[in-house]
Swiss-Prot record:
This is Indole-3-glycerol phosphate synthase. Keywords: Amino-acid biosynthesis, Aromatic amino acid biosynthesis, Decarboxylase, Lyase, Tryptophan biosynthesis. GO terms for biological process: L-tryptophan biosynthetic process. It comes from Neisseria meningitidis serogroup C / serotype 2a (strain ATCC 700532 / DSM 15464 / FAM18). It catalyses: 1-(2-carboxyphenylamino)-1-deoxy-D-ribulose 5-phosphate + H(+) = (1S,2R)-1-C-(indol-3-yl)glycerol 3-phosphate + CO2 + H2O.
Amino acid sequence: MTDILNKILTAKAQEVAAQKAAVNAEHIRALAAEAAPVRSFIGSIRGKHRLNLPAVIAEIKKASPSKGLIRPDFRPAEIARAYENAGAACLSVLTDEPYFQGSPEYLKQAREAVSLPVLRKDFIIDEYQVYQARAWGADAVLLIAAALEQEQLERFEAVAHELGMTVLLELHDESELEKCRNLTTPLWGVNNRNLRTFEVSLDQTLSLLPALEGKTVVTESGITGKADVEFMQSRGVHTFLIGETFMRADNIEAEVGKLF
């Protein structure tokens, strides 16, 4: 595990402890049970595939540790509507505050503005956060293999599925495959950003494709335009998580539209 990931996870453990003190586990489970009905995240992706279109998971991200502030003019509901109008399949919303300037309020605002399913993009280290995600209205959660042990991955996936949510499993390299062998989610993402160097290469996804046969593979990071989309589609990858390229655009709707 890298130094930056270690720092993030240490801070996250403190954050979750404080959240549990404010809203106990029993209460967060009750809130999750009362949340608005789940929208099918994987269903929306498959719907695009049936139309022979790339399925774009469009990200709402204000900042990142590597790039700092990405979009000063940050209006989550407006961004969500632009994504929906442009043909995105789903949304991904950052809820991590210390490193990504995210917020659960951004997720709620985005989901209320559109009919698309929404992923909570965060560092999930406790099943409490899975219930919390559903309570906030999320339809899917991200589980990062590099951040979790096998037992945690399996338990958190089971909780998410019990709540009707989709799990997006995120891999970085082949060394993480073994601990994920029992997971049943159909949605497997490959982050093209090297956790050690922060360099981005689409080869990360390509190198893992043989091991992910039969999965719906999501390529994450490094997709900058239609040429990248067409290249990955030629290799059998039809689902794309894209954030920074859209967030830096003056006209987000037009930028997304360029991919189709």
